[in-house]
Amino acid sequence: MKAEIHPNYHSITVVMTDGTEYVTRSTWGNEGDKLNLDIDSKSHPAWTGGQQQMLDRGGRVSRFQKKFSGFLKKD
């Protein structure tokens, strides 16, 4: 196997939307970094039955809704 071609694999802390934390290993960030999730299995509509609203980060959702608002409307 070639040396120095694999990314650094280290421990990070993942912070869920409800504040719970767990330690896992990842190539993301640096050793000991915290990854704060905006959405997870406890808050994603696919796992909660679609009752929660989507977060509009940077206006992306509202731009999408504006662009495609009349897409499926029948005249």
Swiss-Prot record:
A GO molecular-function descriptor: structural constituent of ribosome
Keyword field: Ribonucleoprotein, Ribosomal protein, RNA-binding, rRNA-binding
Alphabetical list of InterPro entries matching this protein: Ribosomal_bL28/bL31-like_sf (IPR034704), Ribosomal_bL31 (IPR002150), Ribosomal_bL31_A (IPR027491), Ribosomal_bL31_sf (IPR042105)
Record's keyword annotation contains Electron transport: no
GO cellular component, one term: ribosome
Disulfide bonds, paired cysteine numbers: none
GO biological process: translation
Self-association and partners: Part of the 50S ribosomal subunit.
Main function: Binds the 23S rRNA.
Family (UniProt): Belongs to the bacterial ribosomal protein bL31 family. Type A subfamily.
Name of protein: Large ribosomal subunit protein bL31
Lineage of origin: Bacteria, Pseudomonadati, Pseudomonadota, Alphaproteobacteria, Hyphomicrobiales
